[in-house]
UniProtKB/Swiss-Prot annotation:
Gene assigned in the entry: trpA
Domain of life according to the entry: Bacteria
Keyword set, alphabetical order: Amino-acid biosynthesis, Aromatic amino acid biosynthesis, Lyase, Tryptophan biosynthesis
GO molecular function, one term: tryptophan synthase activity
Protein name (Swiss-Prot/TrEMBL): Tryptophan synthase alpha chain
NCBIfam families: trpA
Catalytic activity field: (1S,2R)-1-C-(indol-3-yl)glycerol 3-phosphate + L-serine = D-glyceraldehyde 3-phosphate + L-tryptophan + H2O
Pathway: Amino-acid biosynthesis; L-tryptophan biosynthesis; L-tryptophan from chorismate: step 5/5
EC assignment: 4.2.1.20
Subunit structure: Tetramer of two alpha and two beta chains.
């Protein structure tokens, strides 16, 4: 059982839902990024999604796209992101999921990625643009599968495909609440209720976390009864973007984390 499984077990015992917080590694620069993440851990984030900056993040909206641009300009890459995780592990025991597009992993090398991710202290990986049927070439290089493989389910995913995705997932399943890119509008709770019910009937107990369109405490409060957790990213990156030259940027992100966690 890795840290992700342990976290969900702890939350279930406390009748709590998970706050999964996304930030881009190295935004606005590596030093302040570390400070922001440490503050998020202290402020109540249950699982950290650490975005690996990429030059063409097609699933992300403009806010997270700009965060990738800032991080890349500051020199962040996959190897340095692993160094960041390793450094975080000295003070932060929160489960960490490396959130990446496939291209950086392909360039890095699948076996090396797996080894370095585990060595750094990462607990899982979410590859946003790699569907299960195309992932065998990569995952066969991961002999022990000690790294949780988070899978995405979209509103357009047919029920039989949900079952296939769930069979290949571990850690949790990320349910995308709406079509489009990150940072869009609010989720339709009626449709989301149907989606979560359909997915839960097919995922054999794997936790389900809902993301896209959740930026305020009231969004998190409304969605939390339907899932095991919520994923928030754009809201944090908006704060980082607005206060990137402010020494209080980490504390402002921490305040947002605290408010969202309190709503769950």
């Amino acid at each position: 059982m890795n840290r992700i499984d342990e976290k969900f077990e702890q939350l279930r015992k406390r009748n709590e839902k998970a706050l999964v917080g996304f930030v881009t590694a190295g935004d606005p620069d590596p030093g302040r990024s570390l400070e922001i993440i440490r503050t998020m851990c202290r402020s109540g984030v249950d699982i950290l999604e650490l975005g690996i900056p990429f030059s063409d993040p097609t699933a992300d909206g403009p806010v997270i796209q700009r965060s990738s641009t800032r991080a890349l300009k500051a020199g962040m890459n996959l190897s340095k992101a692993f160094e960041m995780i390793r450094e975080l592990r000295g003070t932060c025991d929160v489960p960490i999921v490396a959130f990446s597009y496939y291209n950086p992993i392909l360039a890095y090398g699948g076996a090396k990625f797996y080894r370095d991710a585990l060595d750094s202290g990462a607990d899982g990986v979410l590859i946003v643009d790699l569907p299960p049927e195309e992932s065998d070439e990569l995952t066969r290089q991961w002999p022990d599968r000690d790294l949780a493989l988070i899978r995405l389910v979209a509103p357009t995913t047919p029920p039989d495909r949900m079952s296939a995705i769930a069979q290949s997932a571990s850690g949790f399943i990320y349910l995308v609440s709406m079509t489009g890119v990150t940072g869009g509008g609010e989720p339709d709770l009626t449709e989301l209720s149907f989606l979560t019910s359909e997915l839960r009937s097919r995922c054999d107990g794997i936790p389900v976390c809902v993301g896209f369109g959740i930026s305020l405490p009231e969004h998190a409060r409304a969605v939390s009864p339907l899932a095991d957790g919520v994923v928030v990213g754009t809201a944090f990156e908006r704060i980082i973007e607005a206060h990137q030259n402010d020494s209080a940027v980490a504390s402002k992100v921490g305040e947002a984390v605290g408010a969202l966690k309190a709503a769950l």
